From Swiss-Prot:
Residue positions with a glycan: 458
Annotated organism of origin: Homo sapiens
Quaternary organization: Homotetramer. The channel assemble into homotetramers or heteromeric complexes that contains of four pore-forming subunits. Interacts with PEX5L with a 4:4 HCN4:PEX5L stoichiometry; reduces the effects of cAMP on the voltage-dependence and rate of activation. Interacts with IRAG1; regulates HCN4 channel activity. Interacts with IRAG2; regulates HCN4 channel activity.
Biased composition (Basic and acidic residues): 121-133
Protein name in the entry: Potassium/sodium hyperpolarization-activated cyclic nucleotide-gated channel 4
Ranges annotated as biased composition (Pro residues): 163-174, 995-1004, 1029-1042
Compositional bias annotation for Gly residues: 105-117, 1122-1137
Superkingdom of the organism of origin: Eukaryota
Biased composition (Low complexity): 918-941, 966-986, 1005-1028, 1045-1056
InterPro entries from the UniProt entry: cNMP-bd_CS, cNMP-bd_dom, cNMP-bd_dom_sf, Ion_trans_dom, Ion_trans_N, K/Na_HCN_channel, K_chnl_volt-dep_EAG/ELK/ERG, RmlC-like_jellyroll
Amino acid sequence: MDKLPPSMRKRLYSLPQQVGAKAWIMDEEEDAEEEGAGGRQDPSRRSIRLRPLPSPSPSAAAGGTESRSSALGAADSEGPARGAGKSSTNGDCRRFRGSLASLGSRGGGSGGTGSGSSHGHLHDSAEERRLIAEGDASPGEDRTPPGLAAEPERPGASAQPAASPPPPQQPPQPASASCEQPSVDTAIKVEGGAAAGDQILPEAEVRLGQAGFMQRQFGAMLQPGVNKFSLRMFGSQKAVEREQERVKSAGFWIIHPYSDFRFYWDLTMLLLMVGNLIIIPVGITFFKDENTTPWIVFNVVSDTFFLIDLVLNFRTGIVVEDNTEIILDPQRIKMKYLKSWFMVDFISSIPVDYIFLIVETRIDSEVYKTARALRIVRFTKILSLLRLLRLSRLIRYIHQWEEIFHMTYDLASAVVRIVNLIGMMLLLCHWDGCLQFLVPMLQDFPDDCWVSINNMVNNSWGKQYSYALFKAMSHMLCIGYGRQAPVGMSDVWLTMLSMIVGATCYAMFIGHATALIQSLDSSRRQYQEKYKQVEQYMSFHKLPPDTRQRIHDYYEHRYQGKMFDEESILGELSEPLREEIINFNCRKLVASMPLFANADPNFVTSMLTKLRFEVFQPGDYIIREGTIGKKMYFIQHGVVSVLTKGNKETKLADGSYFGEICLLTRGRRTASVRADTYCRLYSLSVDNFNEVLEEYPMMRRAFETVALDRLDRIGKKNSILLHKVQHDLNSGVFNYQENEIIQQIVQHDREMAHCAHRVQAAASATPTPTPVIWTPLIQAPLQAAAATTSVAIALTHHPRLPAAIFRPPPGSGLGNLGAGQTPRHLKRLQSLIPSALGSASPASSPSQVDTPSSSSFHIQQLAGFSAPAGLSPLLPSSSSSPPPGACGSPSAPTPSAGVAATTIAGFGHFHKALGGSLSSSDSPLLTPLQPGARSPQAAQPSPAPPGARGGLGLPEHFLPPPPSSRSPSSSPGQLGQPPGELSLGLATGPLSTPETPPRQPEPPSLVAGASGGASPVGFTPRGGLSPPGHSPGPPRTFPSAPPRASGSHGSLLLPPASSPPPPQVPQRRGTPPLTPGRLTQDLKLISASQPALPQDGAQTLRRASPHSSGESMAAFPLFPRAGGGSGGSGSSGGLGPPGRPYGAIPGQHVTLPRKTSSGSLPPPLSLFGARATSSGGPPLTAGPQREPGARPEPVRSKLPSNL
């Protein structure tokens, strides 16, 4: 109903009441509490309560109809009075309540009995105690006329009011304590009252409505509004509403100092005071005629406003600085104002000069007037100067406005003070300039005054004011005396006064300006002061220059030129605000850390609130191995190295963390951590670490799993962590989703470690000086052409070349074994290198080295074998786990298989024996060269060639048993081979180009013969060195080591005995297959530099040995065979002479077109047993087999003279 317009509410209130019930507008709270507190009624909290009326007495039922009609008339007369004050836009819902005395007894007329009268009297007394008159009017409003609000008589009431004496009147209820005089409205109904009420209804409604609206609007201007300034001063909207109630209850015309009316009035007085303080000195000093109309009007208007302000100050509340409560009591306001600034304001507001002139003009004596005329004028000017005392009022108002601007617009208080000080200095300079001219004028311009000396007596007032102002500012700024030094005594004293005032103002200005400048960048000033103390400390202790420089760099990186007391600042904030700030400051850390990305947000917040920021310089040891750990660290920015004894260092970069292992195990540090760059870290103490993990057990399990994985990567174990993790796994504490999250965190940690290794290898690897022939193929076609000639292969085995050429690069070979290698295996594998290099026999002459086919080199390159450092980007990555079929499970060969290879039964045992899983090292340059599919024959077991065991010097339990041979063409020497050597075969996918016709399925003999391969380069054979004229024996394959996680690759110039490889080429998901265009392009690049093979080599290719029909045509033994066995017996188990391409199918000859003339050959690789088609030309075919024991013809290569 409160949302209805006032006219409709008045109509609803004037409706006739029901007989059995009556509607009452009441507050939900108790009326007595509301009135006692003087509180404001909230219209939205009102509700309608229906109170049942007592049934009329039987004796009073006779006159029910008449009383009902009179009640309706009284209700009509009551409506306007009640509705006049219901619509209050200002919330002014004040009430004055009272009680009505009944005008007649409840008994019936002449027929009423005494008992009936007594019964009616009781009900009438209960009715009288009800609240009837609820007028909503302010204390200043007129009371409701009695004739307008008459209580409707109850049904059955008697028409003769004088039949019985009226009952005693209800005593008036006390109104609010803040009201001056409580009142009681008593409405008396007389005969004809309803008619009188009907006659005055329209006029009273209009008059009361207009008066109430104006009073409410004006009253709202005297109360504090709900704005930004009031909310900051009082704290909340409820407090502002309570202050509004205090203003209404304080009395009539009490003005709140924060009200809108006082705000605009102060603004008007401020402008008027500034005008007076500027215009009045100029008018008094430079204008002699002060009786002009504009001057009089200006003074009268100004004085009138100041007198009104003087009166309003007695009704305006006073703000006490030491107390939050504002004084609103009129008596206290009056006493406090009289004791403070009343006298000064009164004197500055009274027109004393005009009063003096009026008094003086009443004297009729002409002589007196003539004698006193000049003195009267002078005295009047002096009295006019009393208006300048309004400066005190200006200062008070400016001070209030400083608070308003500071609270409302957040302006710096120092800036406001500077502006006020500048304005005050300019005003004092203005007054001083007027004073410099006023004093000589009051003395009638003596000859020694500066005005007479400069002949400025009769000049215009503008020129006089300009020179006077110049003279005054020269004195106040202490820069001179103006045009000339003072001569007369009055000028001397005025000059001294100006100097004193000016020096004081100048000192105040310098002080405020200095404070303002310092407050603009206090954090930088604090940093500079702190660093000055540090410099004095370093000088006092005579620290060396390098230490001083490190301290200087630390301060620059740690504080970056600004210093804050961050702990104190965050400690003063609330908990939600502090968490929000910390989350914002650590947003980069959270974004770069997978641990936080997969964790609960509450865990992240709890962890971040306990972090402490630290900075470390390059070379600082953050933690040391063997010490007791008290902190763990999170890397926000920087690179650190994890150093362990006997293992290669590990790099950690942005988003990683370390130092958690000893916090979990409560032990000592398992590794040292050194900062490589400037590192910005966040540390977490052990107490806070355990406190957070107690609330989040899943994150404790994640920390333990990652710590166990990290220990495994550096070759260490911790039984406590292992027991905890296994216990959690067995107990099933965590569900599947939580386990998946933990596994994701562990996987992210591994990937970040691998990324750090790749970054380290790319940033810190320095290439060793090697011949141009070892330069990678991708750098220059000419270098690639030189690297693929037969000279490159011959240089590999030349005995007179320096050993530095064949030394493995820093990032490859045995020097960079992965974390999985233990020191025991490392020493054992390193012991094989000197003997292998020392016993290797070179080729008889470079001319005896044949040029192998391009297919063999591509196969070996794509198979994932080790390569020199220059070829490391081109090598495929190996999987972190052994691929399917690594354990030697046989599978049926398919006709479409391109190459048949051998695998090792029981390779998984050999893999585990070497310790640790193989980590992958990806290279972006490698993905186009990886084969698109694995050959199904890769997992097919095949017999080991003769002499395939015993050459590596490995323990017998590491080597698998030789599988049974399925090749019908295997020689008897192959069956009787001595055990002890290892044969490994790798398979690649078919490498064919669009020019290559489809191949037919291979016979079983070819599958069995594919087990042959090249022996490890540099390994010592069992027998002696055989001359190169012996027929080649069954070659041995080359066990290649996969790339490590650190990015290192094995060298082809040293035997890579670091670890066994998986027996087939692993393929990563999403890797595109090798495109034939890449091979064709390589062929076209080299074809110009090497146009054709030597003719002798072409002739030799047409010859084939019967015993070599089962061998792969891509197998090239590079060393002379040991022993003097001939033919294909292979009983000696040694290495054969420099090999030639042999046909894979008997009865066919091998042809090499010109396009395949070693053009696309990579740098020399160790040769393996494999077979592939020729890229860029027709398939290679085998020539007729040569007789057993026939000596192969030596092939002399035609090399350019520059090589």
